[in-house]
């Protein structure tokens, strides 16, 4: 293990922070925390056409919501252009890079001819300087790209901390463009310079980057830099076994916030996507950091299971502090245009419902019934507020006017009404639920009445008698 572990999360702001990226960030963050190291956030925004400020903010918001705090950064590649160009000049001077004047049309013809011969399309090195080689005359009016002079012999090999030994023959790699004709450096080159300058010791990222790794290793070696250790995480599949995508539901991290998930539930679930600690399924962030290592990451694809995430979320809601849940519900109600102070104390409401919901939106749905005038459906009214039901409510209202407003007294008032009208509990409780909350199913009715309060209960019953 390196004496000072330094990891990084380096998203491109061409879209929002998705679940796969969040897992990569989590594993990189946890590995640094586990070893007392440094976690760096780097925004790879060199794709100017596709990068947006909104996407950058979404990444920062997602990281903040998940509690993945960076020790350094965020660093932005667009602010490091002078550094990249300086390194390119050094490589040109050292002979590890060269100018290529081949036009786009010329390269297209080259690839077509290679395909026609049954060969893999690749740059043929026509502008690569070699001893005794005569290069073509520089064409007028053509701005050259800069290519990395990749080794032509041997293999690039690394012991991937997830996938094991990987070897790629240098003969399979052509000379990568590291600077475009307009002088802007390319992705693979910027990544290498950043990892080198920032002293990254462990690169933990998705396995869609495996093919970039041999090129990056060769550039690092050409710069005389130490090569970091690599750990490539397998992709995440949807419930149906295909690659996770929007059609599987929420894939943006902040969509999970909007959908009512707690960050600790998402963290707990992400931690189990491709990593395990025995049979432990529920654990705190602190436990995860203590237990996390790269040895227990599976090289096979992880499968996203929405039901398991929902189960975890319900668990964390059930065990969350009422005041915290009430604050979240209050903000959700406010975003709906509902005054969260128009009803009883939200702490009392969430305490009633938090063991009955799967997400915070369901909790807000329940709380809303306590804050607004409810309007039962015609079907509920016809089914439950019959003449007998209304008569029972009238008797109950009279009893509730002066009963001690606590569950024992409320329960007794309901029982006395049942006895007076020769009714069973559902024949009184369900009409009462419909009249007070507009629904037929709620927690225990005496608890509902206690939380709703005498004034609201009497007013709501009074509408139906």
Swiss-Prot record:
Subunit structure: Monomer.
Protein name per its UniProtKB record: Glutamate--tRNA ligase
Organism of derivation: Aromatoleum aromaticum (strain DSM 19018 / LMG 30748 / EbN1)
Sequence motif 'KMSKS' region, location on chain: 243-247
Its job: Catalyzes the attachment of glutamate to tRNA(Glu) in a two-step reaction: glutamate is first activated by ATP to form Glu-AMP and then transferred to the acceptor end of tRNA(Glu).
InterPro entries, per database record: aa-tRNA-synth_I_cd-bd, aa-tRNA-synth_I_codon-bd_sub2, aa-tRNA-synth_I_CS, aa_tRNA-synth_I_cd-bd_sf, Glu-tRNA-ligase_bac/mito, Glu/Gln-tRNA-synth, Glu/Gln-tRNA-synth_Ib_cat-dom, GluQ/Sye
Residue sites binding ATP per the record: 246
Lineage of the species this protein comes from: Bacteria, Pseudomonadati, Pseudomonadota, Betaproteobacteria, Rhodocyclales
PANTHER family from the UniProt entry: GLUTAMATE--TRNA LIGASE (PTHR43311), GLUTAMATE--TRNA LIGASE, MITOCHONDRIAL-RELATED (PTHR43311:SF2)
